[in-house]
């Protein structure tokens, strides 16, 4: 069994980037590589083909499978938690809806999830040469350690050597590295083989003394330092990344994406950010919509609750005014449902209010049902090919008003679709932007841009990390004789 766990000092430390780049670097060596994340907490997900229909996994693991040149499958992300509120998450197990968990009943439910997640790892390990597993958050969350099956709980199960990634751009990375190891039990410390520094800016010679001291103090090696790079873009899994997302270009047409509290699949607008004539911004105040050329209502895990938030902020009036002025509005999945006449959830699928009036811009009604739609649809819009993926409980009933649009309807300047990923299709995106904004086709290719970014990440990993040493580490048990750092776990 050959595998490696990429853990991190914190959330958003760079685990996903290192895992993705390492998958590409190892795939280039002719190895059959699979990514794996036992449990992902994200509302950014993707549908891939399963044995009996579509299955849902985290978007990051889908991209990592592309990096590994492997076919994405449910075993690569066996447990996906999709937060619907601060204390309640929808659980996807092996690609299928499993139920809901809250903070109060999580301890009881995770035993079954842990067993399924570790069985999925064992299945992959029997079919692939190398498994590059990604941890979640930090392995040193003292209050969560007893039931951990994602970080060192997985490493113990599979005997995985573990490398910890730290983001030096935030500061405090040496304390974070040392503290991560020192707060682990002796058994878990023995699994930590070393470190990777992420997002370093400046002269590596200035960092070298600190790395030598870290190796001396911990008895563990540093496997390399990834530089900060302005062109590193990947489908993200974490809403933390929204804080810095925009693609400012002077004189460009502005696309304002409403930053809903429970936003999901916000990668739907990444393709717009690729266009040279567009400036994509995330907005949470009505004033940000006033000068927008296109307003986007994205997907959400809690449609009715986020619609109430929209109204509480006055954003509903801003959207209505935008449409009344003849300027385009686009709703995707939950955002599409908000644009309709009414949303009904009589069975409490979303766990909140059972009914709400929509914005009334599209002649549709939405009813939530228990069964989740997981599909990979294809279609056309005015002779332009279109495709996407569907992940939703809402069933749309269109009225007589409106024209057809892929996965939805159009009424004048207002468009709605249930298809995520539709605008990753270059032909549909070009046609839509020409129709709505008069923006000429740029020739930009989103699939090529993603592949180029994955290759760039693979190049950076090859250049700045000791990939051969990491592969040797994955092929063997963790090094023997690693020193214990006090105090250990409380």
From Swiss-Prot:
Pathway(s) served: Cofactor biosynthesis; adenosylcobalamin biosynthesis
UniProt keyword list: Cobalamin biosynthesis, Glutamine amidotransferase
Pfam family of the protein (one): CbiA
A GO BP annotation: cobalamin biosynthetic process
Gene3D superfamilies according to UniProt: 3.40.50.880, P-loop containing nucleotide triphosphate hydrolases
Cysteines paired by S-S bonds: none
GO molecular function, one term: ABC-type vitamin B12 transporter activity
Active site residues per record: 333, 420
Annotated ranges, domain GATase cobBQ-type: 252-428
Role of this protein: Catalyzes amidations at positions B, D, E, and G on adenosylcobyrinic A,C-diamide. NH(2) groups are provided by glutamine, and one molecule of ATP is hydrogenolyzed for each amidation.
UniProt record similarity statement: Belongs to the CobB/CobQ family. CobQ subfamily.
Protein name: Cobyric acid synthase
Species this protein is from: Mycolicibacterium vanbaalenii (strain DSM 7251 / JCM 13017 / BCRC 16820 / KCTC 9966 / NRRL B-24157 / PYR-1)
Taxonomic classification: Bacteria, Bacillati, Actinomycetota, Actinomycetes, Mycobacteriales
GN (gene name): cobQ
